[in-house]
Each structure stands twice: as structure tokens, then as C-alpha cells.
């Protein structure tokens, strides 16, 4: 749950 603007793989 975040912003996949910088890291789409880390948008947890």
C-alpha cells in the first residue's frame, strides 16, 4: 500500500 511511482514492486 504505497506509491508505485518509484518502486512498483514495493507498493505493498
UniProtKB/Swiss-Prot annotation:
Gene Ontology molecular function terms on file: aspartic-type endopeptidase activity
GO biological process: proteolysis
Keywords: Aspartyl protease, Glycoprotein, Hydrolase, Protease, Secreted
Entry's localization field: Secreted, Extracellular space
Glycosylation sites: 4
Tissue occurrence: Chorionic epithelium (trophectoderm) and placental cotyledons.
Enzyme class: hydrolase
Keyword Amino-acid biosynthesis: no
Record EC number: 3.4.23.-
GO CC terms of this entry: extracellular region
Keyword Cell cycle: no
Top-rank taxon, per record: Eukaryota
Family statement: Belongs to the peptidase A1 family.
Note: On the 2D-gel the determined pI of this protein is: 5.5, its MW is: 55 kDa.
Protein name per UniProt: Pregnancy-associated glycoprotein 55E
Organism: Bison bonasus
Amino acid at each position: 500500500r504505497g506509491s508505485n511511482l518509484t518502486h512498483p514492486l514495493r507498493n505493498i
